[in-house]
């Protein structure tokens, strides 16, 4: 095999030219056809007795094409290994030809860039700290009660306010004529939920049971119906009932409904606090890890392999499409392109390259002890921890994902021990449920 490499003065793209004997390919084709002959079935012949000439005539072209692909792929990776080239992404093959008893082809590809790490002491990182307060726990208890709340009809004189639920009929009209989809009966609507177009729920506030009213609203410019977007219409509203929230008492039945067999309010509060503290710990670690990696990547100037960026952008787009499709949206209606995900893809590829260099330079790896401790911590949040532990034991890919988390954690700790840090205290809500 003859190999020549064309290296640019700048940039990551290389070109490799390869020449190899076609005899190797001929030999592989003969071997594959001989294997096929043993099992191939054709009318008029017993299994395994089809003449080789017939097998060649029927399958020779297809097999040669398959063997050519395998040969080119294998020889390419042998060639780049011989030249000590560390390729990034997939190669593009060109100029494939057979002549004078040789297979000749070229391939262009990118190589991984050299990454020069900054001194960690030069980094400035803003980290967050937080704690679960009694008020946070009280809010969570209230949310749990709201999950199991009931609606109770109020007396006939009560005026509907935000947070109440009304049972209504409505008829929508445009220029005095009813429009399609604008009419419904006995609809439950929580005021302030934002379910309806702007102004609709506000127009019902202050109404009482059996009251009728006509309100005027304007559909948003981005409304899905072309006939209605931006149009001002009226709705005839009839209120059948005004209902208020009734929260359940924190009694034994309520507590046990969350799987807490003690059935006491104290046990519920302790369980909630424990879960919130675990969630907060994970969120703080994630935010601080992200801050560290962003600060590190910002200090590094490196050319990114475009093939890796394109692959990452496509993967991000596919992931987003899957989420939209799970919501019932059609891919063709969404109009997503990989180009829209390029900035995020570039950031991820850059962080990946920098992390790889840190791992290599400082010989960082996940230990078995750390992996087992991580699994134990994850399992403790489940009803049957042993089942979770056994699941991880049977899933090597899940263990690799844990190793990646642990390595990033060790890198984060190492950088934080040397970098200039500024600690900012934030509330549980700010950390766990930041505003969009």
Curated annotation (Swiss-Prot):
Belongs to the FKBP-type PPIase family. Tig subfamily. It catalyses: [protein]-peptidylproline (omega=180) = [protein]-peptidylproline (omega=0). It comes from Hydrogenovibrio crunogenus (strain DSM 25203 / XCL-2) (Thiomicrospira crunogena). Keywords: Cell cycle, Cell division, Chaperone, Cytoplasm, Isomerase, Rotamase. GO terms for cellular component: cytoplasm. Consists of 3 domains; the N-terminus binds the ribosome, the middle domain has PPIase activity, while the C-terminus has intrinsic chaperone activity on its own. It is an enzyme of class 5 (isomerase). Pfam families: FKBP_C (PF00254), Trigger_C (PF05698), Trigger_N (PF05697). GO terms for biological process: 'de novo' cotranslational protein folding; cell division; chaperone-mediated protein folding; protein transport; protein unfolding. This is Trigger factor.
């Amino acid at each position: 095999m003859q190999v020549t490499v064309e290296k640019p003065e700048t940039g990551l793209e290389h070109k490799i030219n390869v020449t190899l004997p076609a005899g190797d390919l001929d030999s592989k084709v003969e071997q594959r056809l001989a294997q096929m002959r043993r099992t191939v079935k054709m009318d008029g012949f017993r299994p395994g007795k089809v003449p080789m000439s017939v097998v060649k005539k029927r399958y020779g072209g297809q097999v040669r094409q398959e063997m050519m692909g395998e040969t080119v792929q294998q020889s390419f990776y042998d060639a780049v290994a011989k030249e000590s080239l560390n390729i990034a992404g997939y190669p593009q093959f060109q100029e494939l030809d057979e002549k004078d008893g040789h297979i000749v082809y070229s391939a262009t590809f990118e190589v991984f860039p050299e990454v020069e790490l900054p001194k960690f002491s030069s980094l400035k990182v803003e980290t967050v700290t937080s704690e679960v307060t009694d008020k946070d726990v009280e809010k969570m208890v209230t949310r749990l009660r709201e999950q199991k709340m009931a609606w109770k009809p109020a007396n006939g004189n009560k005026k509907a306010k935000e947070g109440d639920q009304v049972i209504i009929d409505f008829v929508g009209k445009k220029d005095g004529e009813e429009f399609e989809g604008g009419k419904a009966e006995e609809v439950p609507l929580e005021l302030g939920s934002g379910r309806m177009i702007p102004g609709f729920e506000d127009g019902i506030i202050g109404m009482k049971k059996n009251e009728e009213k006509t309100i005027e609203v304007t559909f948003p410019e981005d409304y899905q119906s072309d006939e209605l977007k931006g149009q001002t219409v009226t709705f005839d509203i009839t209120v059948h009932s005004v209902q208020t929230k009734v929260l359940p008492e924190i009694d034994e039945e309520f507590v046990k409904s969350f799987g807490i067999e003690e059935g006491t309010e104290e046990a519920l509060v302790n369980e909630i606090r424990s879960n919130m503290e675990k969630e907060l710990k994970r969120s703080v670690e994630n935010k601080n890890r992200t801050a560290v990696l962003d600060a590190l990547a910002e200090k590094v100037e490196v050319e990114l392999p475009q093939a890796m960026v394109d692959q990452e952008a496509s993967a991000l787009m596919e992931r987003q499409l899957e989420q939209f499709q799970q919501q019932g949206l059609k891919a063709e209606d969404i109009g997503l392109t990989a180009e829209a995900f390029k900035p995020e893809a570039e950031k991820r590829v850059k962080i990946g390259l920098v992390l790889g260099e840190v791992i290599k330079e400082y010989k960082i790896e996940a230990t078995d002890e750390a992996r087992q401790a991580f699994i134990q911590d994850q399992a403790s949040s489940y009803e049957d921890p042993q089942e979770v532990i056994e699941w991880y034991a049977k899933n090597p890919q899940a263990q690799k994902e844990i190793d990646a988390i642990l390595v990033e954690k060790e890198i984060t700790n190492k950088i934080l021990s040397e970098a200039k840090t500024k600690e900012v205290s934030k509330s549980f809500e700010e950390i766990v449920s930041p505003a969009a």
